[in-house]
Amino acid sequence: MELLSTPHSIEINNITCDSFRISWAMEDSDLERVTHYFIDLNKKENKNSNKFKHRDVPTKLVAKAVPLPMTVRGHWFLSPRTEYSVAVQTAVKQSDGEYLVSGWSETVEFCTGDYAKEHLAQLQEKAEQIAGRMLRFSVFYRNHHKEYFQHARTHCGNMLQPYLKDNSGSHGSPTSGMLHGVFFSCNTEFNTGQPPQDSPYGRWRFQIPAQRLFNPSTNLYFADFYCMYTAYHYAILVLAPKGSLGDRFCRDRLPLLDIACNKFLTCSVEDGELVFRHAQDLILEIIYTEPVDLSLGTLGEISGHQLMSLSTADAKKDPSCKTCNISVGR
């Protein structure tokens, strides 16, 4: 049988967190003959792994020939925000069950995307199922070392400046390494209604009245839901003043929440005053997208311990947790 030509001119497009479309060129004489495609897909760090031989049990992707471009989809082998290399080989399955194969194409590299809004909406729905009842609170707070606040006063005009969010949480979160903001907490102790006296982030705490950051002029977005191999679950929310740079970033990427009616964090008017509530059964991580003036709040030392084991800095999400994972790239 006549040999097959080697595929060439690979093109990758329509990339998502767990899929991509691929096409390539081959000789016209092969179009009617080819019955299967072999696709060698590797994470970039493994791009030098040996390609499988057609006589072996395939360890890569095998697909029946379809018109190109074709979509490759699968959360079990594609992760978001991950660099991959891909090469293709065409084949004709013969009557004896063996394959006549082409040479391998050139290798092309690409990077998968972030979670889309519909994926985040699925995470949001899962988070809502365990959020629990709503508790009142009155302040947002941020713990850090004393030197951090001294630096803000001395070198930053008494302002807490936004910084780039780390890679904690879901690997596919569009905020990781992209959104600038200042991290705050709002959870309270059940028995006192006050912020806890322990913190993993430092013994000095800045507290600011909730209405300074959260009010009808603020948009609220859902950003992530994750855990760190423990029973605790975390939800990341973004507070962005309407029309701000942070608001424009979130608008196209994150689900927008109704500030007066959602399962995580609310601001509503009761008896002419703003009232704030947070979900009892989630640890909320709040990202405020603008600089925060220290003069708008108070700074003091907490009486409890610095519980480093609870820090979420660059924390990796447990990919096996059924509570906070969805069936797309993780």
UniProtKB/Swiss-Prot annotation:
Highly expressed in the brain. It comes from the Eukaryota. Pfam families: PHYHIP_C. The keyword Glycoprotein applies. Keywords: Glycoprotein. InterPro entries: FN3_dom, FN3_sf, Ig-like_fold, PHYHIP/PHYHIPL, PHYIP/PHIPL_C. Residues 6-115 form the Fibronectin type-III domain. One of its GO terms (molecular function) is protein tyrosine kinase binding. GO terms for cellular component: cytoplasm. Glycans are attached at N14, N325. The keyword Cytoplasm does not apply. GO terms for biological process: protein localization. Interacts with PHYH and ADGRB1. Belongs to the PHYHIP family. Its interaction with PHYH suggests a role in the development of the central system. This is Phytanoyl-CoA hydroxylase-interacting protein. The gene is PHYHIP.
